[in-house]
Amino acid sequence: MDITELLAFAVKNKASDLHLSAGLPPLIRVHGDIRRINLPPMEHEDVHAMVYDIMSDAQRKMYEEMLECDFSFAVPNLARFRVNAFNQHRGAAAAFRTIPSKVLSLEELNAPKVFAEMTNRPRGLILVTGPTGSGKSTTLAAMVDYVNQSEYGHILTIEDPIEFLHESKKCLINQRELGPHTLSFPNALRAALREDPDYILIGEMRDLETIRLALTAAETGHLVFGTLHTSSAAKTIDRIIDVFPAAEKDMVRAMLSESLVAVISQTLIKTKDGQGRVAAHEIMIGTPAIRNLIRENKVAQMYSAIQTGQSFGMQTLDQCLIDLVRRNVIAPSEARTRAVSKEIFGAA
């Protein structure tokens, strides 16, 4: 099989990822589980050639110099893929993450209504958080698509690499990728403030300067979407504050309390029928009470504020899990593995 055939096989089998690793057969990840494809082990030269064939000259140069490389790659009429090529003790390797060619709508994702409502804000910061592979990019793409279909504005994305491709509908959309289009997130964000955007999507808020510029953009009249790898709203607030030096923490708390629209922390859970995965969300909305807790550094009290904030569209992860179990979407045993209060779902 060549690389296109392997990727087509992965998509046909609803795999989220394809793994090539010298010394092993190709593997796919389906509904969270790694499975081997019934093929012979691949040699280093096979994997190296497959990866090299789909790289540009600049990407090959980076791979040779840095020993790893991130890029995106499209197979016409199939899908786009986010690729990381790297080296391991048996030889060359690569991980391909499937990016569906169709952007799913918020309705198709069965997203809570508050997801659409929060995109109507004229400015502020919306954070979608969770571990790698939790569907953050899919949720953000659906929110961007909702804006694209309902508002007349300029959406600017800064990604590493570009994942979902958006067509300009009611909005003008400009998508920028680290490497080909800009040298860094901070460079692109500084330039963004002079590019007349209404909405800015930051693929990953990974360092102090990016976070600082995101807060500034949110404060100065832009609706900013960003991601972090944190697992809850409270941990997200802590992570942002902790990045800054002690002398700046109070100022950052004040900025964050003024600009925060929402934190959506999500995880993917296997469905009861075994046919897929469903997103479970913790949702924290920037209400006056939440803003006050951020300003006064009372992060520990956020969980109870979220618990009692359902009228604002808030929910804890456990409240979401209870609803999914009641609707027979997931099994109680599966909910228990993700729950904060595991006793709610009975003994293991």
Language model region names:
Residues M1-A348:
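Short, flexible helix-loop junctions that flank or precede catalytic/ligand sites
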